[in-house]
Amino acid sequence: MGIVFNYIDPVAFNLGPLSVRWYGIIIAVGILLGYFVAQRALVKAGLHKDTLVDIIFYSALFGFIAARIYFVIFQWPYYAENPGEIIKIWHGGIAIHGGLIGGFIAGVIVCKVKNLNPFQIGDIVAPSIILAQGIGRWGNFMNHEAHGGPVSRAFLEQLHLPNFIIENMYINSQYYHPTFLYESIWDVAGFIILVNIRKHLKLGETFFLYLTWYSIGRFFIEGLRTDSLMLTSNIRVAQLVSILLILISISLIVYRRIKYNPPLYSKVGALPWPTKKVK
């Protein structure tokens, strides 16, 4: 039962001394697909088709850097003794919450420079972000990482999973929870929900609901994982950040409705976001 017949090599192919990993390919596919999805919403909103190019470029770049910095900070005892490992990103070690923080800051700065409404842009890209995250989790599967605790093969079979997933969750003589799959399904479900309800939401609420939906799923799924970044022996960083994001997002939705009463996106089949700045 422990023999893996369909083991997936994390390396897709080699270009001379360079190994191209499935992880990087899948992340790139997620970003590109998210970009094309956002472009459709961008056109409906009446913005120029090139509006997102700089935003996505700088958000992806600084998000990636921040994701690495975030991981290193919470694993500092190891990296303090092995500083040369900090730049060796190919050895693994990025954190999605760090990426979200870095990408968010970069995106807001670009919006301000280009005189764009960050709430409007956030609403446009939110479904794309969670879709890209759902796709990106399959990169963890290819790397045989970010899995949950030990389970039996019988448990995995009861989930009616394809054999290639079951067999590749057999790592170091043990089967594990496919937490990558749980989160991928949760994220794709979030994408479907957001694209179907955003025209009924007010300015900024699609983005805040994205943060809320993602954080709820991440909180519970994180509890199953074995590789969590820990703040203390009992507190997982991702769970703490998820709680904070849920509270902040819901509070901002309520606050903005009371304080500003932003416009409602009510036109059926359209995304009538204003192109002027809205508080």
Swiss-Prot record:
Q: Which amino acid positions bind a 1,2-diacyl-sn-glycero-3-phospho-(1'-sn-glycerol), per UniProt? A: 137
Broadest EC class? Answer: transferase
Q: What is its EC number?
A: 2.5.1.145
Q: Which PROSITE patterns match?
A: LGT
Q: Write out the transmembrane intervals.
A: 18-38, 55-75, 89-109, 203-223, 235-255
A Gene Ontology biological process noted in the UniProt record is:
lipoprotein biosynthetic process
Q: Does the keyword Membrane apply?
A: yes
InterPro entries, A to Z? Lgt
| Subcellular localization | Cell membrane
Provide this UniProt record's keywords sorted from A to Z.
Cell membrane, Membrane, Transferase, Transmembrane, Transmembrane helix
Molecular function per GO: phosphatidylglycerol-prolipoprotein diacylglyceryl transferase activity
Give the membrane topology.
Answer: Multi-pass membrane protein
Pathway this chain belongs to: Protein modification; lipoprotein biosynthesis (diacylglyceryl transfer)
Cellular compartments per GO CC: plasma membrane
Instruction: Decide whether keyword Transferase is in the record.
Output: yes
User: What does the record give as the function of this protein?
Assistant: Catalyzes the transfer of the diacylglyceryl group from phosphatidylglycerol to the sulfhydryl group of the N-terminal cysteine of a prolipoprotein, the first step in the formation of mature lipoproteins.
PANTHER family in the cross-refs: PHOSPHATIDYLGLYCEROL--PROLIPOPROTEIN DIACYLGLYCERYL TRANSFERASE, PROLIPOPROTEIN DIACYLGLYCERYL TRANSFERASE
| Family (UniProt) | Belongs to the Lgt family.
Q: Which HAMAP family match?
A: Lgt
Name of the molecule in the record: Phosphatidylglycerol--prolipoprotein diacylglyceryl transferase
Native organism is Staphylococcus aureus (strain bovine RF122 / ET3-1)
**What are the top taxonomic ranks of the organism?**
Bacteria, Bacillati, Bacillota, Bacilli, Bacillales
Q: Quick one: which gene encodes this?
A: lgt
